[in-house]
Regions:
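Conserved ABC transporter NBD signature motif
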Residues: 14-24, 32
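ABC ATPase nucleotide-binding domains
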Residues: 183-232
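Conserved ABC ATPase signature
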Residues: 88-92, 96
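Catalytic Walker B motif of ABC-type/P-loop ATPase nucleotide-binding domains
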Residues: 113-117
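Helix-to-loop junction immediately C-terminal to a conserved catalytic motif
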Residues: 6
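Conserved ABC ATPase "signature" region
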Residues: 66-84
Length: 232
């Protein structure tokens, strides 16, 4: 799906349009690359150069975008990387490399960013760094398509789509997911930990009001309630 949306592969049939751009049209490929950025699972398959300046400026030059230095500076700020502290890229951890690939996408400043299982290859510290970047991007108005098999990560989303055999079979708003856990069970998907904890607390007559709370807010509320229970 990620490769089709970004124009790297053609659909088996029909067509995919991104803001009226046909993703299969080779003549529109550069326009599509400016509009849709993509971050893959393995950053080592996405990084071409061993120098951070060369890596981040490569796509900008190919797409004939101006203000290269400013774009790179702003992109690195968003992923919290100081380029002066970065040596050769092949010496970085996978988590750091993934932050570099995200910066490369952000430098182009696309309308949409596709994250295709971006935390699969990285450790827990790297995962948390990527999650924070995504949350900040959402807060700053970026439109993100996040593809994952890890149901813990669906809590990052505002709207959740479940695909089965390449077809969209369910669409759920995140705030509705708490009351629609059976949908996940129907497709043999793991229940996110935060929802499992809420269900266990409810069985112990501890009911947490989750109305108007984000998932992060619910997590904080669970911690608060559990701390209060310990004190009592």
């Amino acid at each position: 799906m990620a490769k089709i949306i970004s124009g790297l592969e053609k659909p088996n049939k029909g067509q995919v349009l991104v803001d009226a751009i046909n993703t299969s049209n080779k003549k529109s490929f550069l326009d599509l690359r400016k509009k849709v950025g993509i971050v893959f699972q393995n950053p080592e398959n996405q990084i071409i150069f061993n120098n951070i300046e060369d890596e981040l400026s490569f796509a900008l030059k190919n797409l004939k975008l101006n203000d290269t230095d400013l774009r790179i500076e702003e992109a690195l700020k968003k992923v919290k990387i100081d380029k002066n502290k970065i040596g050769e890229l092949d010496e970085l951890s996978l988590g750091q490399k993934q932050k570099i690939t995200i910066a490369g996408v952000l430098a182009v400043n696309p309308d949409y960013i596709v994250f295709d299982e971006p935390t699969t290859m990285i450790d827990s510290e790297g995962k948390e760094a990527v999650y924070k970047i995504i949350k900040n991007l959402k807060e700053n108005g970026y439109t993100i398509i996040y593809i994952t098999n890890n149901t813990e990560e669906i809590m990052l989303a505002d709207k959740i789509m479940i695909l089965d055999d390449g077809k969209i079979v369910e669409q759920i708003k995140k705030e509705d997911l708490l009351n629609k856990v059976d949908i996940l069970k129907k497709y043999n998907l793991k229940i996110p930990t935060v929802i499992t904890i809420l269900e266990k607390l409810k069985k112990n007559n501890i009911d947490i009001n989750t109305e108007n709370l984000s998932i992060e807010g619910i997590t904080d509320r669970i911690i608060e309630v559990m701390n209060n229970e310990k004190r009592n």
